[in-house]
Amino acid sequence: MKKILLLAILALGIGLQAFAQEDAIQRFFSKYMEDERFSRVYISPKMMQMAGGFLKNNAEGDKDAEQLGALIGKIKGIRILSSEEVNGKSLYTEAMSTLSRNRYEELMDVQDKGSSLKFMIREEGGLIRELTMISGGEKSFSLISMLGSFTYEDLNMLAEKTNIPGMDQYSKGSKGPK
C-alpha cells in the first residue's frame, strides 16, 4: 500500500512539474498579452490541422506537398510575442529565466552586436515537443513557441519549405543531429 501511495505521489509530482513549466511560459505570454507595445499571434492546433489537411488534399501527386501537409498537421500550436519598442535585453533575460534548464536543451545560441538569439527545445521520448526561439536586442524582443511532436528531420523540413516565423533563423544554424 505504501508503494502504491509513493508511486501515486511521485507521478503527481512529475505531472505538476510539467504543468508548472508550461504554466511559466504561458504566464510570460499572458503578462504581456495586453501590453500595446507587443504584437501577439496565436495559431491554434485546429488551424494547423486545417492547413496541413488543405496541403495534403491539394497536393495532386506532389510528394513534397503531401509530406509538408502531414508535417504541418503535427504542429499543435504557435505562439508569437514581439515588439520593436521595448528593452529587449531585459525581456530576453526574463524569458530565459522562465525556461527550466533541466527541461529545455539549448539548440543554438547567437550573440551579435548587442542582440541575443537562442533556440531551445523540449524533448520527450525521442521527439521534440516544443521549439522555442527567444531573441532580444536594444529595442526589440521576440518569443516564438511552436508545440507539437517533431523529429529533427521535421524541423529541418519546416525550416527549408515554410515561412513559419523564426524558422529562417533556425535554417541558418543547427540542422540537428544526423
Where are the regions that the model predicts?
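Surface-exposed flexible segments
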Residues: 87-102, 144-147
